[in-house]
């Protein structure tokens, strides 16, 4: 368990801390707002250890399954959502990587414009990435995210792949009307070139629908 915690500290610590905070009834908008003594108290709580152990046990069993499938000549394809939830450890621990206002509320949300699937478009409610902030950190959050999932899968399908090229920005005061959104430019190949510099080519399947 300790080895797993050390190898996955970059995401597991924040994830377990976030869930421990919620389980104990606390409501703190971002990790940076937690006082040091409170953070130490939460980390020592058995709830924190429980959430770490659940992840350890899940990936232990998952990797056993993957190994068995690979031995039988079967590969596993992961399916990665493009966006994350506002109510997540990702946003909570890294608010600077999302388009949020001073009170840490989304200034815009994700969705799609009107098309033949929906005359009114779609408003998903997910917070949008701050791609300028991501670029300053060499897309480290995304690079690690892709690398992690490829470690546990033989190939990775990324949903809403077109969002890397451009994405539909719906102002937060218009979240009920996706028609009032507009297109914004995404990171494009820059993100994947950064990934390749660190990890080489990747077996990625791009959703070609939307």
Task: State where each predicted segment sits.
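Conserved, well-ordered alpha-helix/loop/beta-strand core segments that scaffold catalytic motifs
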Residues: 51, 56-84
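Alpha-amylase-like alpha-glycosidases and glucanotransferases acting on alpha-linked glucans and related
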Residues: 1-59, 84-210
